[in-house]
C-alpha cells in the first residue's frame, strides 16, 4: 500500500458487494495501466480499493463513503482508466471536485497512472482560460476533471460534448452539494447520456447526498466506512480553552514558544480573520502564507508552492484548503476557530498525519465553543483531550 493511505480495519467497512480483490494483478487491468499503478508507488490495494474498483469497472453505480487518505482518488482513477476506450478521442469520463486545487490534484494522479497509456486528461476549472478549455475539449481529451461551475458552462456553451460520457464521478460530494453547486450538478446530470454510470464519493452522508443517490443512481453498490472510523488514525486531538476570542492570539504565540514545529496549517472561519492573523504574525517575525477563495488561481499556486518548498512555515487558510491538498510535511494543524460546518472538521485535521507521520490537531475553544466541541466528539465518536502542560513531548 502507498504511504499516503491510512489503513482501515476490515471490520470497519460495510459493503453490499461481496467480491474483495487483494491484489492489483487480480483486477485483470490493462498492462499499461498496471505499470502506471506500480510506477506511482501503489503496492497493494487499500481497503476501499479492494472493494470499489471492481464494481466500478463492471459498470455498476457505486456510492462510497470514504475520507481523504483512504485511497479513494486511486480507486476511481484506476477504474476510469480501465474503462476508457483509447481509440475514441472524445470525453468519456467526467470527474467533479468542489475546488480547483482538488481537481488539479486528481488530474495529476490520473495522468501519473496513465503515463504508459494513450489518454489525455484535462482540468476544466474556473480561473483559467476558456480558450484552453475549448482547445482541450475539442482536441481529444478523454477524461475531464473539473469544478461544477466551469464544467456546466462548457456543456451549456456546447463546447463540451457529452455524447460519449459513460462515467460520471463526484468526489467530495457532501462539500459540493453544501456549497451552492447543487443546481449546477443537477443540471449536469440532465445533460449526460441517461446510460452514464454514476460514482459518488463522500466523507459524510447528509440529506443532500442521499437525495442525489435516490434521484440519479441505479441500485448503487454501497461501500461505507463506519462513522466512528472517520477520524484518521494517527491524529492526536487536543483543545485549549482560551475562554474569550481575544485571548486566541496570545495562546498561539505561547504555543509556538513551547514547541518546535517544522510547518503548520492554521484554519480560521473567515477571510478577514485569516488576513488579520497573518498580519499580526508577520509583525512578530513569523514566516506566514495565507490562502482563501478570493485569490486568483496563479496567486494560490504560488503560495502553495512556497509552503511546500518550506520557505513559509505557517499556512493560514479558510476551509478552502481543508479538502484534498497534500501537504505532506505538516505535523500540526491548529483550528484557530472550530469549523462552522462539523463535516469539515475531519478534512481539516486530516492534513496532519495522512502520510504515515504522527499528526497533532489543536483546537482553540472559547467558553461559547465548548458545546460545539462536544458535538464534534459525538458526531465522530471521538475524544478531544485537553492539551497537556508537557506539550513539547507530543512533538518529540
Curated annotation (Swiss-Prot):
Residue ranges constituting the Helicase ATP-binding domain according to the UniProt record: 53-223
Record key words, sorted: ATP-binding, Cytoplasm, Helicase, Hydrolase, Initiation factor, Nucleotide-binding, Protein biosynthesis, RNA-binding
EC code: 3.6.4.13
Name the record gives this protein: ATP-dependent RNA helicase eIF4A
Pfam families for this protein: DEAD, Helicase_C
Keyword flag Transmembrane: no
Subcellular location field: Cytoplasm
Organism: Kluyveromyces lactis (strain ATCC 8585 / CBS 2359 / DSM 70799 / NBRC 1267 / NRRL Y-1140 / WM37) (Yeast)
Entry similarity comment: Belongs to the DEAD box helicase family. eIF4A subfamily.
Amino acid at each position: 500500500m502507498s504511504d499516503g493511505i491510512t489503513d482501515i480495519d476490515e471490520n470497519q467497512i460495510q459493503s453490499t458487494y461481496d467480491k474483495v480483490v487483494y491484489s492489483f494483478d487480480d483486477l485483470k487491468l490493462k498492462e499499461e495501466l498496471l505499470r502506471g499503478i506500480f510506477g506511482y508507488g501503489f503496492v497493494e490495494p487499500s481497503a476501499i480499493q479492494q472493494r470499489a474498483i471492481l464494481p466500478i469497472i463492471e459498470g455498476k453505480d457505486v456510492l462510497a463513503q470514504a475520507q481523504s487518505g483512504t485511497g479513494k482518488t486511486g480507486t476511481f482513477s484506476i477504474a476510469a482508466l480501465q474503462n476508457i476506450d483509447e481509440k475514441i478521442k472524445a470525453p468519456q469520463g467526467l470527474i467533479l471536485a468542489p475546488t480547483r486545487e482538488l481537481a488539479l490534484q486528481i488530474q495529476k494522479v490520473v495522468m501519473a497512472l496513465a503515463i504508459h497509456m494513450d489518454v489525455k486528461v484535462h482540468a476544466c476549472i474556473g480561473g483559467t482560460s476558456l480558450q484552453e478549455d475549448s482547445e482541450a475539449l475539442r482536441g481529444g481529451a478523454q477524461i475531464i476533471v473539473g469544478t461544477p461551475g466551469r464544467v456546466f458552462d462548457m456543456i451549456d456553451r456546447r463546447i463540451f460534448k457529452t455524447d460519449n460520457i459513460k462515467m460520471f464521478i463526484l468526489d467530495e460530494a457532501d462539500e459540493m452539494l453544501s456549497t451552492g453547486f447543487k443546481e449546477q450538478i443537477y443540471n449536469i446530470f440532465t445533460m449526460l447520456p441517461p446510460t452514464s454510470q454514476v460514482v459518488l464519493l463522500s466523507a459524510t452522508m447528509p440529506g443532500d447526498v442521499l437525495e442525489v443517490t435516490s434521484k440519479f443512481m441505479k441500485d448503487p453498490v454501497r461501500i461505507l466506512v463506519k462513522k466512528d472510523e472517520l477520524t484518521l488514525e494517527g491524529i492526536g486531538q487536543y483543545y485549549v480553552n482560551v475562554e474569550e476570542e481575544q485571548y486566541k492570539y496570545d495562546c498561539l504565540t505561547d504555543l509556538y514558544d513551547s514547541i518546535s514545529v517544522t510547518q503548520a496549517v492554521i484554519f480560521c472561519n473567515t477571510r478577514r480573520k485569516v488576513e488579520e492573523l497573518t498580519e499580526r504574525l508577520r509583525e512578530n517575525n513569523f514566516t506566514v502564507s495565507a490562502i482563501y477563495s478570493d485569490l486568483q488561481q496563479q496567486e494560490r499556486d504560488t503560495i502553495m508552492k512556497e509552503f511546500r518548498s518550506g520557505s513559509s512555515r505557517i499556512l493560514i487558510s479558510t476551509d478552502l484548503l481543508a479538502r484534498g491538498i497534500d501537504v505532506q510535511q505538516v505535523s500540526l494543524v491548529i483550528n484557530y476557530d472550530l469549523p462552522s460546518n462539523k463535516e469539515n472538521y475531519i478534512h481539516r485535521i486530516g492534513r496532519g498525519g495522512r502520510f504515515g507521520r504522527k499528526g497533532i490537531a489543536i483546537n482553540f475553544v472559547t467558553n461559547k465553543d465548548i458545546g460545539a466541541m462536544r458535538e464534534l466528539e459525538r458526531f465522530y465518536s471521538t475524544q478531544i483531550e485537553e492539551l497537556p502542560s508537557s506539550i513539547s513531548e507530543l512533538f518529540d
